[in-house]
Amino acid sequence: MRDGLTEINGLRLAWQEWVGGDARPPVLLIHGLGSSKRVWDLVGPILGRERRVIALDQRGHGESDKRDDGYDIEQIVRDDRALAEALGLRLPVVVGHSWGADVALAYASLFPYGVSAVVLVDGGVVDMRSLSDASWADIEHDLQSPDVSGLSRDEFLARTRSRRDLPWRPELDEIALSTVCVREDGAISPRLTHESQRKILRSVREYRPADYFEAVACPVTIVLADNSTADERARAFLALKQQGADAALMGLRRSPDRRVVWFSETAHNIPVHRPEALTAEIEMTIATLDDE
């Protein structure tokens, strides 16, 4: 694996790369809100055994530059597309998690002949504009990164390890730490600023998948987590995801191959909870391209 920092129109975007071979197509991995490229640390090494795989820190996240503006989905897509071109990723499979799935769907819609396939990982299909204010408030609460400012490094890691929805594994420490800065006094602060997070959330509130379905001309795989045993809120959101998946199968009329895969008893953070199973689904999507 190697890391890099590439300037795109005055904005430096950080990325990491796994290259185990020259099989086509390459893969672009897009993280979710408040996360970082490191969320793919358990997927990239497997996926990159035969091909080139790039995971990036999107605008305002991780080690990429921070900006006061440019956090609407289509600007984020332009950032990500420009980086893919700068790094020579020709017709990548674009994989997005959570908010990153919103970005991935928009990417495939805005550049329909610039991608080989798209994989939406527990995101991308829920019509946020159709939700009541009360329903949106619940989702917004779940999407927001917890306020960790002022915690020590050890306190932050202890909180991460105590999460009930995600079994702890040693690699999670570095993945979690990639989302924060450790100050000289030992306290931490989020890399994504609160104001930038609020701007992204406003963009998410306006997200309507149907705006992007019609132009998508590549295979689409939708991977969704079923954690409905967690609580009543999780069950309610599961119903929204089911509705969104059904609408996607209907709306993606130009897609030559579209399928929905459910992971039972799985946390929202699929790339770190079920990395092997997720990688298998991405590879299955790539295999369908070989059959065409």
Describe the residue ranges of each PLM region.
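Active-site loop/oxyanion-hole signature of alpha/beta-hydrolase fold enzymes
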Residues: 8-11, 16-18, 54, 58-99, ...
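Alpha/beta-hydrolase fold catalytic core
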Residues: 1-27, 49-51, 89-90, 246-250, ...
